[in-house]
A protein has these predicted regions:
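Donor nucleotide-sugar binding/catalytic pocket of nucleotide-sugar-dependent glycosyltransferases
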Residues: 1-16
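Conserved donor-binding/catalytic core segment of Leloir-type glycosyltransferases
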Residues: 18-37, 43-47
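Short alpha-helical donor nucleotide-sugar binding micro-motif in glycosyltransferases
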Residues: 68-74
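A short hydrophobic beta-strand element within the catalytic core of glycosyltransferases
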Residues: 77-78
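Aromatic "clamp/platform" in nucleotide-sugar-dependent glycosyltransferases that forms part
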Residues: 81-82
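Short glycine/serine-rich donor-binding loops of glycosyltransferases
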Residues: 87-90
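Short hydrophobic beta-strand element within catalytic cores of glycosyltransferases
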Residues: 99-102, 109
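A charged, aromatic-enriched C-terminal amphipathic alpha-helix characteristic of glycosyltransferases
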Residues: 123-176
Length: 177
């Protein structure tokens, strides 16, 4: 038996042209609009942080290029997901130096660096979010205001994801041997 990742070696190359775009104080919700993704939490955040731009990607009809341009301009990709199998959108974001802000649950527990995970209970429900709203907004402010300091960690996150979760290298080696 060979433990391998999901073969996505092509993704880094396909996003290269979006990597060095000027960053804006933009936070994205790149998930589908579904109850388990908790878009209501994300939609409430602009009331606390009016100086930042928040975009729910599925609220627009975006081409792949338009979506990737948003990723390239954004400083944060936000998740409050209650269901996640692999999480490709946060990997796409990290590939273009966008900070992934993810709960410490689901696949994120194993895949995410501690610096990008927040306590699971902060977004366990909308009610829980209301109790932890200040902590979440402070984390977002820190990521936005200190963005450049996080770039080395984003790249470390990309290396971990690329090598351990989004590579078919072990599978290919197993087939060849």
């Amino acid at each position: 038996m060979v433990r391998t990742g999901w073969p996505m070696e092509y993704l880094a190359r396909s996003l290269d042209s979006y990597k060095n775009m000027p960053k804006e104080n933009l936070i994205l919700f790149p998930h589908r609009i579904a109850p388990e993704k908790q878009p209501d939490i994300f939609r409430d955040l602009p009331t606390q942080l009016p100086d930042y731009e928040f975009i729910v990607c599925q609220d627009q009809v975006l081409t792949k290029n338009e979506y990737h341009n948003l990723l390239g301009r954004a400083k944060i990709v936000f998740s409050a997901n209650l269901q996640e199998t692999l999480g490709i959108s946060w990997y796409e974001g990290a590939l273009v130096d966008t900070i992934p802000m993810v709960p410490d649950r689901l696949s994120y527990q194993e895949m995410g660096l501690e610096e990008f995970k927040y306590p699971s209970e902060w977004t366990a429900s909308f009610k829980a979010y209301t109790h932890h709203k200040e902590a979440i907004t402070e984390r977002i402010k820190d990521y936005i205001e200190n963005y450049d300091n996080y770039i080395p960690l984003i790249r470390k996150q990309v290396t971990k994801l690329k090598n351990d979760f989004f590579s078919g290298k072990k599978l290919y080696e197993g087939i060849i041997s």
